[in-house]
Curated annotation (Swiss-Prot):
One of its GO terms (cellular component) is chloroplast. Binds 1 [4Fe-4S] cluster per heterodimer. The cluster is bound at the heterodimer interface by residues from both subunits. InterPro entries: ChlB/BchB/BchZ, Nase/OxRdtase_comp1. The lineage of its organism: Eukaryota, Viridiplantae, Streptophyta, Embryophyta, Bryophyta. It comes from Pleurozium schreberi. Component of the dark-operative protochlorophyllide reductase (DPOR) that uses Mg-ATP and reduced ferredoxin to reduce ring D of protochlorophyllide (Pchlide) to form chlorophyllide a (Chlide). This reaction is light-independent. The NB-protein (ChlN-ChlB) is the catalytic component of the complex. It is found in: Plastid, Chloroplast. Its cofactor is [4Fe-4S] cluster. This is Light-independent protochlorophyllide reductase subunit B.
Amino acid sequence: KRLLQDLNIKVNKVIPEGGSVKDLQDLPKAWFNLVPYREIGLMTAIYLEKNFGMPYISITPMGIVDTAEFIRQIEKHVNNLVSNKKFNYEPYIDQQTRFV
């Protein structure tokens, strides 16, 4: 969640973290879905993409390379959805990985 906060991205829902069946009605409100653990949420993400046109990212943000790719995928989806502003997260990636 900290990574998303750093990128000024508001989390709609974390499923199943404390979720209920009622929370499921809010899932289509998200712009895209994050599936950091494919074995848990990939089938749901595929369903939401097929039925609601919601893209998903299934990269696990662990390690420098995968975290950078995870952020680049977020940037791609955000830029596809927001037409009046373009986001560039490369400076953030550089800042987070410069001294590693």
